[in-house]
């Protein structure tokens, strides 16, 4: 049974374009299915999480990451008597706007777009779901419920500073109340993202031999996990050891999140969803100690993994590809597919840049590499 402060699909604020409900799915389940059927969702399979797609079959990509986030979000929401369907749906959609090559690709595209209001993957997710996906004759986008769109655009909390241009434009026709916190389900999806990525980036980095178990000594509590597991299982293999470490880490993070969130709900005497939105802090949270530990893991990952020599070398290549494609399309829009070229407003520089950014952002890693080799390589075999 849903709590009084949960997002009830029967009380959804609805869709921008009115539709007749279906009797066999609630509104949030319907949104989940629409997201899964988008081209953007399928493309996540070939987009980088940390390691470039072709570097190994077992490394995570944006699709597997999104699925893992959705399972954590669903479990947490269920335990808190929230709408697990809404939490799962927001989790599945949260990375749709990512560029090829992960954060390296986003930084490169943002640099290309600095004269045109920049680029943000969270805002791009909204744009994909409300404009760029073309699946329905009556409207652009996939016409999701207000609650799902709110959760996507407020993935990092209320928007209090500068507002992305597309978000501001869309908000005029469908007010997402940008200055308030999102639903508890959206907050769950956001922290499920943190739980999943820090845990699994550790796992993948060990597998890729960028870090080893000795380096985990920098994280005392993680090192304690390793010590305890080795003491309990004398002949444990390195691959099994990291799986057990990650399993224990995820369990403790979820347990802590549930405890602190219940404490917050009781302390604030929350009775409805509006009280959650208008609160001065996120109702869904970890304890202070666990937040500190999460920040330590993030710093460790930046230092040891994301800023490692191997990852910097990959980042340089990815930056060259994204910026190279942007420049060549800006120089000659005829190199764009016809269905993208016609979106440019009278060859205006700003309109041209935005369309090109949308096109590049939608590319998979392998398509971006292929396109770069074809357009930018001096090798005539690529033509």
Swiss-Prot record:
Entry keyword annotation includes Oxidoreductase: no
Cross-referenced Gene3D superfamilies: Hypothetical protein af1432
Pfam family of the protein (one): HD
GO molecular function ontology, one term from the record: dGTPase activity
Domain of life of the source: Bacteria
Signal peptide: none
Domain HD: from-to ranges: 62-198
InterPro entries named among the record's database cross-references: dGTPase, dGTPase-like, dNTPase_2, HD/PDEase_dom, HD_domain, PHydrolase_assoc_dom
Alphabetical UniProt keywords: Hydrolase
GO biological process terms, semicolon-separated: dGTP catabolic process
Family, similarity comment: Belongs to the dGTPase family. Type 2 subfamily.
HAMAP family assigned to the protein according to its UniProt record, in alphabetical order: dGTPase_type2
Name this polypeptide is given: Deoxyguanosinetriphosphate triphosphohydrolase-like protein
Species per Swiss-Prot/TrEMBL record: Rickettsia prowazekii (strain Madrid E)
């Amino acid at each position: 049974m849903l709590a009084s402060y949960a997002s009830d699909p029967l009380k959804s604020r609805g869709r921008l374009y009115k539709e007749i409900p279906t009797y066999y799915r609630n509104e949030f389940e319907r949104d989940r299915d629409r997201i899964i059927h988008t081209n953007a969702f399928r493309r996540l399979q070939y987009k980088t999480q940390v390691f470039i797609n072709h570097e190994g079959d077992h490394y995570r990509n944006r699709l597997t990451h999104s699925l893992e986030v959705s399972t954590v979000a669903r479990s947490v929401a269920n335990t808190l008597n929230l709408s697990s369907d809404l939490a799962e749906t927001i989790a599945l959609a949260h990375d749709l706007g990512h560029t090829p090559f992960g954060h390296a690709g986003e930084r490169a595209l943002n640099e290309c777009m600095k004269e045109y209001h920049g680029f943000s993957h969270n805002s791009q997710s909204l744009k994909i779901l409300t404009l760029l996906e073309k699946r329905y004759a009556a409207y652009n986008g996939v016409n999701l419920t207000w609650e799902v769109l709110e959760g996507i655009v407020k993935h990092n909390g209320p928007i209090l500073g500068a507002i992305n241009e597309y978000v501001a434009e869309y908000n005029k026709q469908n007010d997402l109340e940008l200055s308030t916190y999102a639903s508890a389900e959206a907050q769950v999806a956001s922290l499920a993202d943190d739980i999943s990525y820090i845990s699994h980036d550790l796992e993948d980095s060990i597998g890729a031999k960028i870090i080893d178990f000795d380096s985990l000594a920098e994280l005392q509590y993680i090192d304690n996990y390793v010590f305890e597991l080795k003491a309990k299982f004398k002949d444990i293999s390195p691959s099994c050891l990291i799986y057990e470490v990650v399993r224990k880490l995820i369990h403790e993070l979820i347990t802590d999140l549930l405890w602190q969130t219940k404490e917050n709900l009781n302390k604030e005497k929350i009775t409805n969803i509006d009280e959650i939105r208008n609160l001065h802090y996120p109702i869904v949270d970890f304890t202070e100690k666990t937040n500190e530990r999460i920040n330590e893991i993030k710093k460790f990952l930046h230092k040891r993994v994301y800023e490692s020599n191997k990852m910097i070398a990959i980042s340089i290549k990815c930056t060259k590809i994204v910026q190279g494609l942007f420049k060549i399309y800006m120089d000659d829009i005829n190199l764009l597919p016809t269905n993208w070229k016609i979106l440019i407003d009278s060859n205006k520089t700003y309109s041209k840049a935005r369309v090109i950014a949308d096109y590049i952002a939608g590319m998979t890693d392998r398509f971006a590499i292929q396109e770069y080799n074809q357009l930018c390589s001096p090798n005539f075999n690529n033509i």
